[in-house]
């Protein structure tokens, strides 16, 4: 499988390994060089998704001797062979967290995300109490892998969709909502290769919880079961869902399942027969460049001064993390919410919380897709609220080639990590 295919499957570590192997065999391959450079500099990916990872080296002499004996007898040029070597070392010493981490890296480079997650879980359980920084660094990698193809059942960030048949009478409520300012239309997305619309019969909208008006204009709404008196025009609107209108179907999508439930309650008020139509419910992991999509559902009134726009956007972002995100259960925390994980005395849970905050900070630090303001949440404040710590270990972005070899001389020269 090519690097680009791996990247489309949300497996950036496997994509990096593909291109790095090409460069190992042919250092002058310009296509691989450009692809690798594009990945390492991708502005919309979190740091951990484009970092370069290295094998860990054992710090205990008896383990170093065991590693040297096993590595001397095996070919390390092949990732499958390298994975087998570290599996053998793990079998010989079940407490060897470094072998487990290296095994996880090999599996991740091969695109076996689910198996790599299991190996990283083992690393965290071995290292949490005695080497929390190394354990947290391992779990940051796990946060990348859980969103990739093959590990869907472990994902924590999802896009939820309702699909229902379209009737010709739907045009009426679509027009009414658009006129009321509750439904905003966008240009049809373009194909990246041809720059042509992905479809000529596709209409793309955002459904807002209130009208997005000019400052100073009255707001208007349209029968919502949760409707309230018209808010001040400076109050932001919130996206309930995106709406794709196609000739034969309607698709309502949101990263926020609660918003989508409101939409499902809202639809029968627009079209009484909506509750009688067959509804298909779909969910898929969010891509790595949109993991915080639920944090960016605020839409600001038109015509606000720049300082007021920035203040309102910052308040909405901070409110999301402080009052919504921390109360959402996560598989990465064994089903706990960050708020409940903060109360745990289990070192494994504590390390995972540290890692998830580190990864989420990286997600927040990159350029959000389609958002005009450069604002970020203060994750140190969130750490204080959750009594979490900032791990010292961070992956590097400056290494251009894959290191699948760990020969005995290298091990002897390497400093323990």
Predicted regions located by residue number:
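"A position-specific structural signal for the A-helix of alpha-solenoid helical repeats
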Residues: 1, 35, 64-68, 102, ...
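TPR alpha-solenoid repeat register
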Residues: 31-32, 99, 133
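Short Lys/Arg-enriched alpha/beta "domain-start" segment
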Residues: 143-234
